[in-house]
Amino acid sequence: MNHIETRLPLPIQPIDRWLRPFARFLHIEATSGLVLILCTVVALVAANSSWADSYLAFWHTDLTIAVGDIVFHHSLHHVINDGLMAVFFFVIGLEVKRELAHGSLSDLKQATLPIAAAIGGMIVPATLYLSMQYGQPGVQGWGIPMATDIAFVVGCLAILGSRVPHSLRVLLLSLAIVDDIGAILVIAIGYTESLDGRYLFLAAVAVGAVHFLSRIGVRRFPPYVIVGVLAWIALHESGIHATLIGVILGLMTPATPTLVPERFREYLHEKEHEFQPKEWSRRLHRAEVVREVQQLTRETVSPLEYLEVTLHPWTAYVIMPVFALANAGVLIEPANLSDSVAIAVVIGLVVGKPLGIALFSWLVIRLGVARLPSGLNWPILMSGSFLAGIGFTMALFIDGLAFGADGLDTAKTGVLVGSAISAIAGMGLLLWTLPKPTRQ
């Protein structure tokens, strides 16, 4: 006779609540990296085939939305880069808030190394780019080689498997999140040409309304969505890139649940008699109890965790691939590869990123304000730092801001080539420096 052993679930510890979102995040980013590669290949093939004109014309299809006297008339490409990407930036805001509240950036001593590494990984590439483009028209692209694409980095680490120490994954993820913060500041400060104070004031009022709704305990999402859309419109008209409203709202999202698990268990204990056969047999009563339990179950999850779990797959598998299809299509020509802008972007990503990360990491460790995490040594850290040169999503996004809506083909070529070299170099060096797998 088969013996089936039933085990009671162990109580959830605080560390589990912090690590489960992190593990889920890594899994989604690893698989979405493969989807991004596929979409990039499709975009490149389309842009270099006989369908190139149709491919470009499709993304420039005009869309018109009219609400009363307000008329929005933009291309599909603009809607993706300014509209859909606002959701992507909202999820970035949620990720940053999570790391600041519970993750690797919540402890300043632990966060010092990734923060310093990220700062070095932004300053050195931008400096190299500026030194190569000083006095030339391409100088405004200085922000392109500063960012790191988390999805591709995690995908590369996933290919290397269990040999990669957990501490390297955490360091690179934390570094990439700080990179995102830097890229957001670059977009807000470096690529805002003019400001309309009236619309900026309206955007601030809308953000204040979101804070007010949160303070008075509004838990339904539709009011926040409506006010968020109004804030997006106001910021769009103010001259600041509208996607930044996503980051602001993400950072404002509460990171703590309304109902702690202990109180939820007490509630279930109090309601235990409701589940007795006599009471449970009444249909209306049953539906009411189930609805109440469902509502309270939702209250045990913070709005931040709920929104991140809900939206992260959509950004990873829909928004970012669509963005790649709309932006990665570039005509592959020898002239693009030899252009000074493309070369500056490649040097910034392939040389500037690892050099800046290694230099600033060495500096803070030398000063004694940080130390290498367990499982890491200098060869592994320096090898992994090459993966941070995979710019892609944010780099292409900044390219569009620096050189117009469609971006500059030479800059896009530099992003694609530099990211590919960084991925190959990083994975190759890690294969060489990581401990060899033990044979069973």
From Swiss-Prot:
GO terms for biological process: regulation of pH. It is a multi-pass membrane protein. It comes from the Bacteria. Pfam families: Na_H_antiport_1 (PF06965). InterPro entries: Na/H_antiporter_dom_sf, NhaA. Keywords: Antiport, Cell inner membrane, Cell membrane, Ion transport, Membrane, Sodium, Sodium transport, Transmembrane, Transmembrane helix, Transport. One of its GO terms (molecular function) is sodium:proton antiporter activity. The keyword rRNA processing does not apply. Its main location: membrane. One of its GO terms (cellular component) is plasma membrane. The keyword Translocase does not apply. Belongs to the NhaA Na(+)/H(+) (TC 2.A.33) antiporter family. This is Na(+)/H(+) antiporter NhaA. It comes from Rhodopirellula baltica (strain DSM 10527 / NCIMB 13988 / SH1).
